[in-house]
Amino acid sequence: MKYKGTMLVVKDIEKSKEFYTKVLGLRVISDFGANATFTGGVSVQTEASWMEFTKCDASFFSYQGNDVELYFEEENFEAFCGKLSEQGVSLIGESATMPWGQKVVRFYDPDRHIIEVGEDLAVMMKRLHAEGLTVDELVEKTFMKKGIIERMLKG
């Protein structure tokens, strides 16, 4: 078996396509009207078509379940956070720095699915190293193997 991607049920597919392309920078690679697939393996399907395929009614859906998230990484994290603010995206709390040093921000898409965007790990490693952490300190802080960290710092 091979995992192929995530499909989100959405109320307004046009609004979702606009969000995922403009806010997250994904590209639509397939558009079948009631279903669209983006780069990165994310797809959206209209609620109406999903109900037709599964024989479920509208009471089946529970948006903003807050129990799963899509995760992305961004090389220019600060600029991305500025873009979220400009677009009026609904944040979940504030951006934060995780205990291992990675900056993250969480927010909702138009159907209240959670999106998390983290600072690219190689960018994080270079930032922490520039702030004075040694490779051994990075191993301790991030729980990553020394060889991986060294490759990230060289890349």
Predicted features and spans:
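N-terminal beta-strand motif that seeds the catalytic metal site of vicinal oxygen chelate
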Residues: 1-15, 68-70, 120-155
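Amphipathic alpha-helical segments
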Residues: 12-27
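Vicinal oxygen chelate
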Residues: 13, 65-114, 131, 141-147, ...
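Short secondary-structure junctions
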Residues: 25-30, 91-94
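Conserved short beta-strand elements that form part of the metal-binding/catalytic scaffold
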Residues: 27-64, 114-119
